[in-house]
Amino acid sequence: MDRYVTDIKNGCYQNPVLPMDFSDPDAIRVGENYYLISSSFTYLPGVPVLHSKDLVHWERIGNCVERLPFDRYAQPAHGCGTWAPALRYHAGRFYAFIPLPDEGIFYTEATDPAGPWSALHCVKSASGWIDPCPLWDDDGSVYMAHAFAKSRCGIKHKIQLSRLDPETLEVVEDGPIVFDGTLSQPTAEGPKMYKRNGWYYIFIPAGGVEYGWQTVLRARNVYGPYEEKIVMHQGASSINGPHQGAWVTAPDGSDWFLHFQDRFELGRVVHLQPMCWHSDWPFICLLYTSDAADE
């Protein structure tokens, strides 16, 4: 059997660009370098860090978490540990926001993404808070969007926006539910926050891991009200349930979206899709042709 390669040597690539289990990826670009992290549950060292120069060739360079500061993790705990993290770069430091669904939201920081990373610092002690993503706003305010795990707190389909202390990055105000996807975007989760041209954007997967889709929310005010648009779904493609991921902009100005696909026994593999803009909405495709969701 031929060895799988992502770079097919004609200026093109093939998906998945990470044909292995890197669940719940988030990614950023700093200068000429891209960095990606993913969840790892109770595997330790955890929350792997990958590096790339081109979004296609990736190399693992370290881990954000050496140990979890709770005795229960001395033994494997199925479905627990580090869930979907977020990676951000602010004022010369890398920040990884990491949820533990039974204990709360934590962050770790580093000046070098290869490490060392600091010990975990508690942002919010809570059961059922998951999938955090911070946003440093232009006026110095810091916010964190997150979802909920129904298995822990009985809440589902909702995105909450909390305000953080700019110095400690701890929650100072839980804040409102800014989006309720119960009717139109069930299982809304995995929020990733961005700001562009005065718009606040929250990218969310919905519909569940196996057969879901990618939705984008946008608003002029960080607290909403948020409009919603489905921007990518499976359609007639073989890529089931294009799930949560990250928007990155390349040095040449092109936009890209990394997301995972659940391949069952192969794990959650990572795909790379081109992204473009029309009327301040992102569309996950090479060229905008219509407002219909892309595949």
Spans of features found by a protein language model:
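Blade-edge beta-strand/turn elements of extracellular beta-propeller
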Residues: 4-17, 58-75, 108-126, 165-186, ...
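Beta-rich catalytic cores
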Residues: 21-23, 83, 128-131, 187-189, ...
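Hydrophobic core segments of beta-strands in well-ordered, beta-rich domains
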Residues: 28-43, 82-101, 106-107, 120, ...
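Beta-propeller domains
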Residues: 38-64
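Structural motif
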Residues: 45-48, 104-106, 154-160, 211-217, ...
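Active-site neighborhood of glycoside hydrolase catalytic domains
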Residues: 147, 160-163
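Repeat-solenoid scaffold signature
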Residues: 233-278
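Conserved small/polar residues in nucleotide/adenosyl-binding loops
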Residues: 288-294
